[in-house]
Amino acid sequence: MGKIKIIIPRILITILVIFASIQAYAASCPIKIGGLAPLSAPGSVTGGEAMREAMLLAERDINAKGGVLGCDIEVVITDTEGLPEKAAAMMQKLITQDGVVAVGGGYHSSVGVASKDVANSRGIPVVFAETWNDTITGDMQKYIFRIAPLSSWASGVIWKFAAQAPGVKSVVIVTENTDYGIPAAAECAKGLSSKGISSVTFGVDIGTQDFAGIVERVKAERPDYTIVLLTGEAGFNYAQQAADAGFGPQDTMFHANQAGLESKAWWENVPDGNLAFMARIGVPETMYSDSALKLAADYKANTGKDGIESYALEAYDSIGVIAQAINEAGSTDGDAIVTALENISHDGVLGRIYFPYGSKKSPSEDGKGSEWWHQWPDPAITMVQYQKEGEPSNTMTIVYPEVYKTGDPIYVD
């Protein structure tokens, strides 16, 4: 009996220690995940509203499957306004006041650049959805991941398509002076130069809406091709103001920002926007998985839109991959979530998401730059074109690259 009396307390103590350990790493229900989105100007409100809807659908779908660690999740969405200082403040609020255990979403590169240090310093994992700037992953921070393409990679698709267009010898690039626009414009200019094509870049501040002066300067250059790297409503306004001046998508070969994939907003704001080219992330709808088709149907039903935008797909997957990582970690501890993310294979609506480079393998081992740290390597990037006035974005003609091509581009002489 004496031995039994000693053993029982030890068993109880062990159980209590295990229980306390679990409690230390598990959040109280619901488990909160932050969601970054630009929901007011000067940010891309069109993009932010799409991302918000997608993240809320992710919350719904994850909870319908049992949530994480036995809890529902709650996606706490915050408005970054597309501004770096606001983004840093909102990241701080999500962590210190809202109690999130990880963060997804993010549209503007400036938001990613400004907010990542806040999250990393506090040990909160972030999976950025649509922030392209290479430096976001380039400084190899422990808690920062990305499923959007690298700016250098995405910009390469834009300039390579422009370079192969017939008769292109000169290009004008109109870009916003942000962490997205500046490096993207530089990559395009460098790439075009490698093909013997001259380019001139005009920069404008985020929030600019009157482009009359810039349009006249662009016209004076008489370029064969125009690349517009202005996000959100600014991109709409430039395109229509250029069209009004006789130098829009129906007057010259014209690349517009991907915010134009929200076709209802595009045609309302740019009625002369037919024949514009745009970059789109993700495979065409005809190649969607069953889960992507279901999401697209639900998204269209909720929003009244004709299709789901690439940045909405990215936002959905950013929440989904975080939720899976928390489950696989068996914990809401930041270090445990990072370990799970570095080993994850997530069947997302964009495809299989994984991160080949991190603490176990440096990008340099495969001859890659540091920007590939915690970077998903497989996002599909296509060039699409509106070829009928008023057509929905999900039927746009894919004109590049050859592997996804559904039709020939229409070039304006």
Predicted regions and their residues:
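Signal peptide-proximal N-terminal region
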Residues: 28-31, 52-75, 196
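Short, low-complexity disordered leader/linker segments with a strong preference
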Residues: 1-32, 412-413
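Extracytoplasmic "Venus flytrap"
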Residues: 31-56, 78-85, 107-108, 174-182, ...
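Beta-alpha junction/loop-to-helix N-cap segments that form part of ligand/metal-binding clefts
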Residues: 45-51, 65-138, 147, 203-212, ...
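Segments of small-molecule ligand-sensing domains
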Residues: 301-309, 323-395
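Periplasmic-binding protein-like
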Residues: 35, 94-107, 127-129, 170-175, ...
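Extracellular/periplasmic Venus flytrap/periplasmic-binding protein
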Residues: 89, 133-135, 142-245, 285-294
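Extracellular/periplasmic periplasmic-binding protein-like sensory domains
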Residues: 242-316, 327-328, 399-412
